[in-house]
């Protein structure tokens, strides 16, 4: 299935010019500078130095297949049908620090970028600040052109790409929260939260979810909607784990 997805026609990222400019400056950094900017090991810095050196000649792949974090493992994009991908292309935005916003079939090359990276192009400010003025109006207009509802399934660090208070004031933001209940206490566990975001994204795509209330039917790995908790903008999904003590 992955080969079939890769064979589909690729779209061009909306902010490709900006991404190319950022990648060009990243390619001028040495490995030591990359290690500091990306806050990573020297091995990863060397790997990404190579990536940026060959950025413009590397093979492009659809954005939905380019990431391998916890959320994407549970999204399982390579097994989506062509009609699923067509729906996702119309309704899903992927947030990232190099390309800004991506559609699922936008062609991109592998990279690593952190929101704290500071470049001459960004005026010495974190790259998230560089994007804020470019993406906020675009995202708001995109959501309003659809149904005015934004289902927020990105991790909170990506909110830095936008004037998030403006986004919340101009469109209806629904942000599901995922908790594990142990001994009567609710705990948000990062790995589970990331996994559930990916699984819920797939659920929305496969079932063509159109309204927030339809999310109540979502269940995954023991997580289910808990109507007694949260509020419409923050629906809670809870997994109950029984802990026995002796």
Model regions: which residues?
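Active-site helix-to-loop segments that bind/position phosphate- or nucleotide-bearing substrates
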Residues: 1-79
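Internal, well-folded beta-alpha domain core
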Residues: 77-231, 236-246
């Amino acid at each position: 299935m992955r080969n079939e997805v890769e064979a589909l026609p690729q779209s061009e990222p909306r902010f490709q010019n900006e991404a190319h400019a950022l990648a060009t400056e990243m390619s001028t950094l040495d490995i030591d500078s990359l290690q500091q900017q990306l806050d990573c090991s020297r091995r990863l810095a060397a790997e990404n130095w190579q990536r940026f050196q060959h950025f413009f000649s590397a093979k492009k792949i659809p954005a939905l297949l380019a990431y391998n974090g916890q959320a994407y493992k549970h999204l399982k994009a390579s097994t989506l049908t062509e009609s699923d991908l067509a729906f996702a292309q119309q309704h899903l935005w992927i947030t990232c620090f190099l390309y800004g916003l991506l559609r699922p079939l936008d062609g991109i090359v592998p990279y690593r970028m952190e929101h704290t990276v500071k470049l001459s192009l960004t005026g010495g400010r974190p790259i998230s600040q560089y994007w804020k003025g470019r993406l906020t109006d675009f995202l708001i207009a995109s959501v309003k052109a659809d149904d005015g509802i934004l289902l927020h399934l990105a991790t909170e660090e990506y909110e830095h790409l936008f004037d998030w208070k403006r986004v919340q004031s101009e469109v209806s933001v629904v942000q599901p929260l995922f908790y594990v209940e142990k001994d009567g206490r609710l705990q948000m566990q990062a790995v589970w939260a990331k996994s559930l975001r990916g699984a819920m994204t797939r659920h929305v795509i496969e079932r063509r979810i159109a309204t927030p209330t339809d999310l109540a039917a979502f269940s995954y790995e023991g997580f289910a909607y808990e109507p007694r908790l949260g509020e419409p903008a923050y629906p809670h999904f809870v997994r109950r784990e029984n802990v026995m003590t002796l």
